[in-house]
Every structure is written in structure tokens, then in C-alpha cells.
């Protein structure tokens, strides 16, 4: 059985690392290069790096910072934020990044996924979905760092992304972001069991037990977390960590 992955998810804002709660209240937690050096030592599976301002502010990716990060990273990187064209993706790949995560741009022009996949392969494209539960209980997809309701169901959009050519889906629960009270297992399983590409679940990890619970209750392929690997203790002191994934009793 293929071991399921455990992936740190780092958020970039103004060249610094931040952590949010429900996509709000970004708190500075350190320098990205220092964090990556620590994760190198801990031999993490891979790394997801998301610029939370780029798409919302209609900015291009920060290629200089991406190059610095890629130069330090010993593990595969997935980068997202501000990628709106094939040329943006091509530039990022040329800097040594293995995957790009496309979110808002795909909602504006789904053909971007196919163009990137056709040129670089589906394995290089991750379709990112930010979703929030509505008043009546259903979930809706949001764009522009969770500020715009696209009035689409996460499952419908996940299937559209799969058909367009993504190699993976990154499913991020806005409601659970930074709360550290467990994943929305029902949401994750609904998506993971109805698409044929790997799904990475993000949003809610507060303990190793939460990771194990998600893996045991769903068919998700990987889990991503931020707060779990950045904060320590009830006062949320900044302390970068990573579990011994070989001790996670899951396949």
C-alpha cells in the first residue's frame, strides 16, 4: 500500500510566513527560508507554498522569492498564488518548482488547466478548492483568498478540474482553517470518493490524532496542515515541527 502523505502548507504574505484563522487575521510566524531549512532537516514529504495576496491583489508570482525557496528546498514544492497564464507557470517550473496550484485563475478560465497539463503533464498541476459551509449546510467554492462566493459546489468543481486535466486536488476548508479542531471528514470523503485523482485535505489539523482519524475515515491521499506544524502549546508559540510519519498507523 502506498503511504499517504503528510504535507506542511506555508502561507506567504509580503515575503514573510503567516498563519490565518478562517482565512483572516494573518499572524507573522517567521522567515520562509528559515522554515524550509528546518523542514529539510525533518525530511518532510513535500511542501505546499501559497501566496495569499497575489490573486486577491492581481499580482504576478514573486519569482525572486520562489527562486530563493526552490534553491533551499530538498523536497518537492507545490507553489500557488498569482498564476494566471501558461507563461507564469512555465517561469515557475523553470525556477525548480515541481507543481503549481491553480485556484482563482481556473475559476475564471478553466482552459488554463488543460494548457498547463498538455505542456508539462497532469502531475504538475494541482487544482485548488477553497470552500465554506453555508447557512443551510451546503458548501460553496470561494475564490480570491476566500472573499468571493462562486456559487458552485465543491464536488461539481472538483470533477470539472479533474476533467480539465489536474493531477491532484487540494481541498481547503475555510471554516476549519487555523481552528485546529479536526477535519471536515464528511466533506473530504465526499470529494475524495467521487474523483479519480488524489485529494489533499487541508484545514483543521490540531493533533496527530486528527491526521490518523482523517486517514482512517476517508480515502483521501494526503493531508496538509499549517498550524499543527508551526504552533506549539495552548498559547500558540511559534515552533516548527513535523511528525515521524512512519509512526502514523495508517497506510
Curated annotation (Swiss-Prot):
The active site is at 130. Keywords: Amino-acid biosynthesis, Cytoplasm, Histidine biosynthesis, Lyase. Gene3D superfamilies: Aldolase class I. Pathway: Amino-acid biosynthesis; L-histidine biosynthesis; L-histidine from 5-phospho-alpha-D-ribose 1-diphosphate: step 5/9. The keyword Cell membrane does not apply. GO terms for molecular function: imidazoleglycerol-phosphate synthase activity; oxo-acid-lyase activity. It is found in: Cytoplasm. GO terms for biological process: L-histidine biosynthetic process; O antigen biosynthetic process. Changing residue 134 to S: In strain: Serotype O16. It catalyses: 5-[(5-phospho-1-deoxy-D-ribulos-1-ylimino)methylamino]-1-(5-phospho-beta-D-ribosyl)imidazole-4-carboxamide + L-glutamine = D-erythro-1-(imidazol-4-yl)glycerol 3-phosphate + 5-amino-1-(5-phospho-beta-D-ribosyl)imidazole-4-carboxamide + L-glutamate + H(+). Its EC number is 4.3.2.10. Coiled coil: none annotated. InterPro entries: Aldolase_TIM (IPR013785), Glycosyl_amidation-assoc_WbuZ (IPR020021), His_biosynth (IPR006062), HisF (IPR004651), IGPS_HisA/HisF (IPR050064), RibuloseP-bd_barrel (IPR011060). Its main location: cytoplasm. NCBIfam families: AglZ_HisF2_fam (NF038364), WbuZ (TIGR03572). IGPS catalyzes the conversion of PRFAR and glutamine to IGP, AICAR and glutamate. The HisF subunit catalyzes the cyclization activity that produces IGP and AICAR from PRFAR using the ammonia provided by the HisH subunit. Belongs to the HisA/HisF family. This is Putative imidazole glycerol phosphate synthase subunit hisF2.
Amino acid at each position: 500500500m502506498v503511504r499517504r502523505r503528510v504535507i506542511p502548507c506555508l502561507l506567504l504574505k509580503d515575503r514573510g510566513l503567516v498563519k490565518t484563522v478562517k482565512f483572516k487575521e494573518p499572524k507573522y510566524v517567521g522567515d520562509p527560508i528559515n522554515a524550509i531549512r528546518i523542514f529539510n532537516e525533518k525530511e518532510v514529504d513535500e511542501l505546499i507554498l501559497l501566496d495569499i495576496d497575489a490573486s486577491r491583489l492581481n499580482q504576478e508570482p514573486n519569482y525572486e522569492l520562489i527562486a530563493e525557496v526552490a534553491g533551499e528546498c530538498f523536497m518537492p514544492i507545490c507553489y500557488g498564488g498569482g498564476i494566471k497564464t501558461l507563461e507564469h507557470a512555465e517561469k515557475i517550473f523553470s525556477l525548480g518548482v515541481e507543481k503549481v496550484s491553480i485556484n482563482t485563475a481556473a475559476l475564471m478560465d478553466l482552459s488554463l488547466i488543460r494548457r498547463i497539463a498538455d505542456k508539462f503533464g497532469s502531475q504538475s498541476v494541482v487544482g485548488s478548492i477553497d470552500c465554506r459551509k453555508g447557512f443551510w449546510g451546503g458548501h460553496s467554492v470561494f475564490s480570491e483568498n476566500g472573499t468571493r462566493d462562486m456559487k458552485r459546489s465543491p464536488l461539481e468543481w472538483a470533477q470539472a478540474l479533474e476533467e480539465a486535466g489536474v493531477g491532484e486536488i487540494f481541498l481547503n476548508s475555510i471554516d476549519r482553517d487555523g481552528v485546529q479542531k479536526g477535519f471536515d471528514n464528511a466533506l473530504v470523503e465526499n470529494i475524495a470518493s467521487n474523483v479519480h485523482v488524489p485529494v489533499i485535505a487541508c484545514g483543521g489539523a490540531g493533533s496527530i490524532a486528527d491526521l490518523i482519524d482523517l486517514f482512517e475515515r476517508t480515502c483521501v491521499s494526503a493531508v496538509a496542515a499549517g498550524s499543527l506544524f508551526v504552533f506549539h502549546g495552548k498559547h500558540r508559540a511559534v515552533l516548527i515541527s513535523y511528525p515521524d510519519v512512519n509512526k502514523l498507523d495508517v497506510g
